[in-house]
Swiss-Prot record:
This is Threonine efflux protein. The lineage of its organism: Bacteria, Pseudomonadati, Pseudomonadota, Gammaproteobacteria, Enterobacterales. It comes from Salmonella typhimurium (strain LT2 / SGSC1412 / ATCC 700720). Residues 65-66, 174-206 are cytoplasmic. The keyword Membrane applies. The keyword Electron transport does not apply. Keywords: Cell inner membrane, Cell membrane, Membrane, Transmembrane, Transmembrane helix, Transport. It is a multi-pass membrane protein. One of its GO terms (molecular function) is amino acid transmembrane transporter activity. Its main location: membrane. It comes from the Bacteria. Residues 22-43, 88-149 are periplasmic. One of its GO terms (cellular component) is plasma membrane.
Length: 206
């Protein structure tokens, strides 16, 4: 059982460390707003991972195989949401360019909205859908007991929370924030283009 937990932990940390919508959302929120806002987003992402992990432990890959239409809806819906997020970031970058001398406009000042945006970002994340629907399911076969499944669920949850807490803390450092102030419009524009790209890729690859 320890080997199973170790393998899952290693696979999951690699999945977390590969840049994707979750990473860019947390880092952009931390550097442009605050660590508190980023941590609310981290909690939202962690709750999203809990949903995916729970469904995967109940047999997500079997559901997707038998209900192809559901897979299409998830992919298209997630892609549209990521495209919308990309559009919002690109629009914000253009506003910064038009009013460079003024203070940056903070669109999501309320912590509750950062939590919700983090949750929706993860639930619409193509990497999460593919990972939990295929790779993750390989480790939770019928021979894995209830205790081990609960252990894996807890491991995935804590690992996700720990990793994105580190990301939020690093990008909220004063040095990182000063760098963002100088390059705000370019960073937001780049992040927006990435989100839109993720969304378009998700829609056309369904």
């Amino acid at each position: 059982m320890m080997m199973l937990f170790f393998t899952v932990a290693m696979v999951h940390i690699v999945a977390l460390m590969s840049p994707g919508p979750d990473f860019f959302f947390v880092s952009q929120t931390a550097v442009s707003r605050s660590r508190k806002e980023a941590m609310m987003g981290v909690l939202g992402i962690t709750c999203g991972v809990m949903v995916w992990a729970g469904v995967a432990l109940l047999g997500l890959h079997l559901i997707i195989e038998k209900m192809a239409w559901l897979h299409t809806i998830i992919m298209v819906g997630g892609g549209l949401y990521l495209c919308w997020m990309g559009y919002q970031m690109l629009r914000g970058a253009l506003k910064k360019q038009d009013a460079a001398a003024s203070s940056p406009h903070i669109e999501l000042a309320q912590s509750g909205r950062s939590f919700l945006k983090g949750l929706l970002t993860n639930l619409s994340n193509p990497k999460a859908i593919i990972y939990f629907g295929s790779v993750f399911s390989l480790f939770v076969g019928d021979n894995v007991g209830a205790a081990a499944r609960w252990g894996i669920f807890a491991l995935i949850t804590l690992e996700t929370l720990a990793w994105f807490t580190v990301v939020a803390s690093l990008f909220a450092l004063p040095k990182m924030r000063r760098g963002y102030q100088r390059l705000a419009k370019w960073i937001d524009g780049f992040a927006g283009a990435l989100f839109a790209g993720f969304g378009i890729h998700l829609i056309i690859s369904r």
